[in-house]
Amino acid sequence: MTAQYKQTNTNGLTARNLNVAVVGGGLVGSLFALHLGKKGHTVDLYEYREDIRTAELVIGRSINLALSARGRKALAEVGLEDALLQHGIPMKGRMLHDLKGNRKIVPYDANTNQCIYSVGRKHLNEVLLDAAEKYPNIHLYFNKKLQSANLDEGEMSFIDPTTKESTHTKADLIVGCDGAYSAVRKEIVKRPGYDYSQTYIEHGYLELCIPPTKDGDFAMPHNYLHIWPRGKFMMIALPNQDRTWTVTLFMPFTNFNSIKCDGDLLKFFRTYFPDAIDLIGRERLVKDFFKTRPQSLVMIKCKPYNVGGKAVIIGDAAHAMVPFYGQGMNAGFEDCTVLTELFNQHGSDVDRILAEFSDTRWEDAHSICDLAMYNYVEMRDLVTKRSYLFRKKLDELLYWMLPNTWVPLYNSVSFSHMRYSKCIANRKWQDKILTRVLYCCSITAVAAAGYFGYKYGNMDLVQHYSSSVLQLLKLK
């Protein structure tokens, strides 16, 4: 079907409409189809699973996700931000659970009270597909698994996993949004000079559920991301619209493998998550834990993302990451924003658009992959340490005093559109400043102690104090 919309770029020049094949009808694929459809391109979207809107259960994917500023911007550009925020549940900070069941609140942003939103994956995907279906120039095809592709020619072969029927098609542009195990990326990897790395971590995850109370309400304060940090492993819980909680246990596979029976499981939870037993329910805990196997976590980095002006990969296909920064979906949605802005700038020059996207985006994608890996250590271990809490308070104070200069790392990642690579550079700059300040203050303190020790004849105190300060600097 011919597109019904006239496309122009930001320079006011009319750009030709493209026939685009979007491979993958998940969150990123359906959103990018909307971005392209809105610009007037003809879009054929192919998804190898059945239509999620009619599926009773989506296997192997997290039920809910954290939506933050980058994702919100991409949704706003297709007019869906407000509707999804109304469905989402705002989370204004972390609520930490200790071994005794005591809870401590750590706000995300104590100064401006910004928050992230817990949104249902299935609902979000349904909204995106419903919106895409309203465009006459967007066509949705389900149960279409990519078998092979000639990316240089824009040719693809799909097969229906159920009927085994084959479909052959051709497009001006192929966009791979088909996840961490992308079939489109597999075609790109075959090309010489391609950089690719795949890293599995030794930790897996398993999902549980906290039901509503007998009164039908949330079992815990629902405007927080709840975390049970335990050093080498952790458990988290995000609220759902139906008053349930999606609980995810992250820990090494060796720990999972050591739990072989009901008794092992209950002993483990009584030791590390005692308050969660009553929240989940003993019978439900046992049933949910043993009904599925823990899933693996993978990080994928690669470049370039494009094949000339004929194909590009975005989302998890380009940069799959572990889920500990809540940026997987947001980074994928930001890919849509970045590409759309390049289409606005360069019109029909697809070679230039894809080359510029690939050249500039990979560094940011690699940066957020690394940050996500680091944040696992923070969430399961560092959040309980005084040094972490002190640094967070100091960051909040400096952010309050210098809001345009000193932006904490989490704020820059979750509440701004600053490039991910710049977020890391900012953090390194802040660390350097604080190290120098600590050093200068410590030297001044030692000098003052020396002066007063000499004046009052107490050099033992000076030596003890100086030794303590130098040890602090060494730890820093």
Curated annotation (Swiss-Prot):
The chain crosses the membrane at residues 397-420, 433-455. Its EC number is 1.14.13.9. It catalyses: L-kynurenine + NADPH + O2 + H(+) = 3-hydroxy-L-kynurenine + NADP(+) + H2O. It is a multi-pass membrane protein. It comes from the Eukaryota. Inhibited by pyridoxal phosphate and chloride ions. Its cofactor is FAD. Pfam families: FAD_binding_3 (PF01494). One of its GO terms (molecular function) is FAD binding. It is found in: Mitochondrion; Membrane. GO terms for biological process: 'de novo' NAD biosynthetic process from L-tryptophan; anthranilate metabolic process; kynurenine metabolic process; L-tryptophan catabolic process; NAD metabolic process; quinolinate biosynthetic process. Optimum pH is between 7.0 and 7.5. Optimum temperature is 40 degrees Celsius. Gene3D superfamilies: FAD/NAD(P)-binding domain (3.50.50.60). It is an enzyme of class 1 (oxidoreductase). Pathway: Cofactor biosynthesis; NAD(+) biosynthesis; quinolinate from L-kynurenine: step 1/3. Its main location: mitochondrion. Keywords: FAD, Flavoprotein, Membrane, Mitochondrion, Monooxygenase, NADP, Oxidoreductase, Pyridine nucleotide biosynthesis, Transmembrane, Transmembrane helix. HAMAP family: Kynurenine_monooxygenase. Belongs to the aromatic-ring hydroxylase family. KMO subfamily. PANTHER family: KYNURENINE 3-MONOOXYGENASE (PTHR46028:SF2). Catalyzes the hydroxylation of L-kynurenine (L-Kyn) to form 3-hydroxy-L-kynurenine (L-3OHKyn). Required for synthesis of quinolinic acid. This is Kynurenine 3-monooxygenase. The gene is kh.
